[in-house]
Regions:
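Solvent-exposed loop/turn segments at secondary-structure junctions
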Residues: 26, 40, 62, 69-70, ...
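Long, low-complexity intrinsically disordered regions
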Residues: 111-112, 133
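Protein maturation boundaries and topogenic segments
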Residues: 1-50, 99, 118-136
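PP2C/PPM family metal-dependent serine/threonine protein phosphatase catalytic domain
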Residues: 72-93
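Surface-exposed loops/turns
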Residues: 58, 101-102
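Active-site neighborhood of phospho(di)ester-bond hydrolases with catalytic His/Asp-centered motifs
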Residues: 105-110
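Mid-length scaffold segments of soluble, non-membrane domains
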Residues: 45-76
Length: 136
């Protein structure tokens, strides 16, 4: 099955506005994935369909320090001062290190101002609807 979605945000986190999701396709590193949000309200209500890029999978080492997110010691993303201000948090509030467990994925947007796993942590593979592609 296939689903088509539209990103109507003022500032998108990915370079596309229209997406096609292949439901049931596995989430693979560096590919886009469509999933349903859980536990990140009030910013996004539970069940909101989101498309992000898989940045890390089970067994990958995550370290957040001084406003920078590292995956297996490779710098992947910086925290946005504007997002931190909106959340009323400082970058050091997110400092931590952990290893992704079975069924966990770290997802990021391509935009530096994306609201993603930098701020709310990993998602469960059970939230994944399928692989996504940006088409326009």
């Amino acid at each position: 099955r296939v689903r088509i979605g539209y990103d109507g945000q003022d500032i998108p986190c990915l370079p596309w506005r229209v997406f096609v999701a292949w439901l049931g396709a596995p989430a693979l590193p560096d590919q886009l994935v469509a999933f349903r949000s859980v536990g990140i309200a009030p910013v996004l209500p539970d069940g909101t369909v989101i498309v992000k890029r898989v940045a890390a999978v089970a067994g990958d080492r995550i370290r957040i320090a001084d406003g920078v997110l590292y995956v297996n010691d490779v710098e992947r993303a910086h925290f946005s001062p504007n997002t931190l201000r909106a959340l009323k948090k400082s970058a050091d509030a997110f400092d931590r290190s952990y290893v992704l467990g079975a069924g966990e994925l770290l997802v990021l947007g391509d935009s530096p101002v994306s609201y993603d796993s930098r701020y709310w942590g990993p998602i469960s593979s059970s939230q994944v609807m399928g692989r996504a592609w940006g088409v326009w």
